[in-house]
Amino acid sequence: MNDILKIGKYELNSRLIVGSGKYKDFQTTKEATLASGSELITVAIRRVNITNPNEENLLDYFKDTNVKFLPNSAGCFTAEEAITTFRLMREATGIDLIKLEVIGDAQKTLYPDVIETIKACEILKKDGFTIMAYTSDDPIIAKRLEDAGADAIMPLAAPIGSGLGIQNKYNIAFIRDAVKVPVIVDAGIGCASDASIAMELGADAVLANSAIACAQNPIQMAEAMKYAVIAGRLGYKAGRIPKKPYATASSPIDGLIQF
């Protein structure tokens, strides 16, 4: 299926993005990522060793693959922190495709601070970054982020790592209608069916981390996510039948034997 996902100047064949946290080791991270078919893995900048060549480095495990790294600003709580983090990262690596995260509540929900996110987005866009912005499932905020220069909107389905699945299907659909840039459902995915539902709602892609890394069999779950995203995308493009309150016969009544 030739169905390219375009994010700014970047093109991806897979509509599944994966995370790198919570795995037992880097080798499992690599094997699960390859099983998922994903071409993009997000990594917290503060967790990646880019200065000490003598320490184990996740980046080294993917040198022989086509998987690209998507640096994120997890751990940043202000626009200024995120901006500084990404500028230093680009200077060290040359990577300009980023996942912008500015957290507002670090204790319970890990919900984003959308005001600080918008501020950071405006400045980073002027700096030439291609921005994928993590945000709430508010369609108004999604539009504001698009106006601020976001190349993709990443609304949460539920709190990060909760596995609750999509808590507000209507808002995800509203966001899809509100913006023209890709919508990538991020956070809260718990199983393959969650990913498929997100795609059926019109999301352009899904990001999954905990659902894969914390599964009993991460590699098998990664493969399940791969096919769930494909199935959901195909179903969305095919167009579902309308919901009706009553039955509609699937077989014609013409030619029935008359008693």
UniProtKB/Swiss-Prot annotation:
Active-site positions on this chain: 99 (schiff-base intermediate with dxp)
Spell out the reaction equation it catalyses. Answer: [ThiS sulfur-carrier protein]-C-terminal-Gly-aminoethanethioate + 2-iminoacetate + 1-deoxy-D-xylulose 5-phosphate = [ThiS sulfur-carrier protein]-C-terminal Gly-Gly + 2-[(2R,5Z)-2-carboxy-4-methylthiazol-5(2H)-ylidene]ethyl phosphate + 2 H2O + H(+)
Entry keyword Transferase: yes
Q: Which CDD domains match?
A: ThiG
Q: Which biological processes are named by the entry's GO terms?
A: thiamine diphosphate biosynthetic process
Leading EC class: transferase
Q: List the subcellular locations.
A: Cytoplasm
Task: State which Enzyme Commission number(s) the record gives.
Answer: 2.8.1.10
Protein name (database record): Thiazole synthase
Encoding gene (name): thiG
